[in-house]
UniProtKB/Swiss-Prot annotation:
It comes from Serratia proteamaculans (strain 568). Its cofactor is Mg(2+). This is Probable GTP-binding protein EngB. GTP binds at residues 35-42, 62-66, 80-83, 147-150, 180-182. Residues 27-201 form the EngB-type G domain. GO terms for cellular component: cytosol. PROSITE patterns: G_ENGB. It holds the Pfam family MMR_HSR1. The gene is engB.
Length: 216
C-alpha cells in the first residue's frame, strides 16, 4: 500500500471542547500539538497549514484553554491542546488544564502521535517532560520541535539539538527531535513527513471493511 501525502493547506476548524468528554467520537486518526503558552504552537500550526488565522493566539491566559480540533480530511485530524505554563494563572485552573491534557493523552484511543513544541533556548521544562512521559507511558510516539530555531546561530542550534536528543534517551520512548522555525520555515518538511507517517497508520479495524468492499 502506497503512503499518502496529505495536503495540510486545506485543514479547517471543526470544534472546541473543554475536555475529552466533550470531543467527537474516538475514531479516525488524531495527532496532537502541545506546548507551553509561549512556545510558538499556534504559529507552527498556521505555518504547517499555510493559514495565518487557523490557530488563533490569545494574549489573555484562559481565553484559549480548550481542546481545538482541525480536520485535514475526513477522519484525519490535528488537535491543538491547551497551552500550559502560564505563570499568572491560579493553581486550581492550572490543575484543571493539566488534568484535561493528561486525560486526552492517556485515554484518547485515536491519538497516534504527539508533537511537543519547546523554545529551543528553554527546552524540557517540567511540564514538557510530563507531556512526554504521559505519551511514552501509553506507547504514543513523540516529535519534539525546538521552536524559534532562527533565534540561534547555526552552531548553537546544533548544540541544543544534540543536547535535547541525548536528554530524552532515558524516557525510553519513540521520540524524534528536530529544530523548527515558523518565520524561516525550518523543519516544516520534517513535521509534514512525520504527520504523513502517523496518518498513514490505518487503524486495524478499518482494514477488513476496506477489503470487503474492494471487490464490490
Amino acid at each position: 500500500m502506497t503512503s499518502k501525502n496529505y495536503n495540510y493547506h486545506v485543514t479547517h476548524f471543526v470544534t472546541s471542547a473543554p475536555d475529552i468528554r466533550h470531543l467527537p467520537g474516538d475514531e479516525g486518526i488524531e495527532v496532537a500539538f502541545a506546548g507551553r503558552s509561549n512556545a510558538g504552537k499556534s504559529s507552527a500550526l498556521n505555518t504547517l497549514t499555510n493559514q495565518k488565522g487557523l490557530a488563533r493566539t490569545s494574549k489573555t491566559p484562559g481565553r484559549t484553554q480548550l481542546i481545538n480540533l482541525f480536520e485535514v480530511e475526513e477522519g484525519i485530524r490535528l488537535v491543538d491542546l491547551p497551552g500550559y505554563g502560564y505563570a499568572e494563572v491560579p493553581e486550581e485552573m492550572k490543575r484543571k488544564w493539566q488534568r484535561a491534557l493528561g486525560e486526552y493523552l492517556q485515554m484518547r484511543n485515536c491519538l497516534k502521535g504527539l508533537v511537543v513544541l519547546m523554545d529551543i533556548r528553554h527546552p524540557l521544562k517540567d511540564l514538557d517532560q510530563q507531556m512526554i512521559q504521559w505519551a511514552v507511558e501509553v506507547g504514543t510516539p513523540v516529535l519534539l520541535l525546538l521552536t524559534k530555531a532562527d533565534k540561534l546561530a547555526s552552531g548553537a542550534r546544533k548544540a541544543q539539538l544534540n543536547m535535547v536528543r541525548e536528554a530524552v534517551v532515558p524516557f525510553m520512548g519513540d521520540i524524534q527531535v528536530e529544530a523548527f522555525s515558523s518565520p524561516k520555515k525550518i523543519g516544516v518538511d520534517k513535521l509534514s513527513q512525520k504527520l504523513n507517517t502517523w496518518f498513514n497508520e490505518i487503524p486495524p479495524e478499518v482494514l477488513p471493511e476496506d477489503d470487503d468492499t474492494a471487490g464490490e
